[in-house]
Amino acid sequence: MTIIAEKALYGVSVPVVGTYANTMLKLDITKHCEIPRGAKIVAANHPSTTDPFFVAQMLHQQSFIMINDVLFQVPMLGAYLRKSGHISVKEGHGQEAIDAALKHLAAGHTIVIFPEGIISPTEGGSHQAKTGVARLALESGAPVIPVGIGLIRENIYHVSSTVR
């Protein structure tokens, strides 16, 4: 997808994600350092499905998220993710995802990765981290910005819906 289309979709997404984050999440962001511009790898834990929204809201700059391929199979969402330049991570095809992320990093972009690869256990703790962050950092030389997400489940508003 062209850079112009990615930037246009990002421009449309910012107010949508911001509205969602500010409406559905109680965010308390504490920065211990300024987030630099340019190529970087943002590595965050993954306690809930809302984490990409949280990280996007925190960064205030375009980023490309490494996302499980399952979400790319959802009809409208998948099309949006592809056209926005996000990176599909398909089981057994990790090198393809790494290569796509390395291209973004070489272009000076920000990559967001959830090292666990899946949502953390609901009872706390985390899954074993995969090697993607280290591989990207070693191959690209880009700095890694660690992000810790402390989730208080009561601070997430739940909206029930049924699709018929």
Q: Language model features by range: what are they?
A:
Residues A39-I41, T110-F114, I145:
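Residue-level preference for the first positions of well-ordered beta-strands
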Residues K31, E123-R164:
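A cross-family acyltransferase "interaction/gating" segment
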Residues P36-H93:
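Catalytic core of membrane glycerolipid acyltransferases/transacylases, capturing the structured
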Residues M1-T30, F54, Q61, P75-S84:
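A transmembrane-helix-recognition feature enriched in membrane-embedded lipid enzymes
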Residues V55, Y80, K103, R135-E139:
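Hydrophobic/aromatic ligand-binding patch that stacks against planar heteroaromatic rings
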Residues V16-V17, K83-S88, E116-P121:
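Short, basic, glycine/proline-bearing loop/turn elements
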